[in-house]
Amino acid sequence: MTVTATETIRKEIFVDASPETAFRVFTEQIAEWWPLGKYGTFLEQADSVVFEDRDGWALVERAKDGRETVWGEVLDYEFSSRLRMTWHPGRSADEMPTEIELTFAADGDGTTVVLEHRGWERASDEVRTARAGYDAGWNEVLETYRNAS
């Protein structure tokens, strides 16, 4: 099967934690596990990434020199089961109109976490060229998350 630059990226992992813990690690402890030096806007100048309330929740990356950029805004969530947000690190939501959705489902003694990164069909050709990098990058990011959970 040939993958086009507009298909939804879908990743699924199992974490050895309850859905509540898995959700909290992703949202409340993201600064502790996200590989900012490789997957961040500021790279080696990155200082932190955190969800914060800005008249609605947003995921914000900060650089050591005080600069900041919003990676995305939370559209909706259900604690311990679902998180959906816009996704546009280093760009405006208009430039990169993609979104991610994570679901957290109890699975035996752990949780199955599914990430879908969609909306590529609304993106410009320039943004679509980043899709392959995200497809590979989400594997590494989620493995780092799994190890932290």
Protein language model regions, located:
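Hydrophobic-ligand binding "helix-grip"
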Residues: 50, 60-109, 118
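A conserved amphipathic terminal alpha-helix motif
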Residues: 91, 118-149
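Hydrophobic pocket/interface hotspot
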Residues: 22-23, 59, 74, 85, ...
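Hydrophobic ligand-binding cavity/cleft-lining segments
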Residues: 1-45
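Short beta-edge strand/loop motif at the mouth of beta-sheet-based domains
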Residues: 28-69
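A structural signal for short, well-ordered beta-strand segments
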Residues: 9-13, 102, 115-117
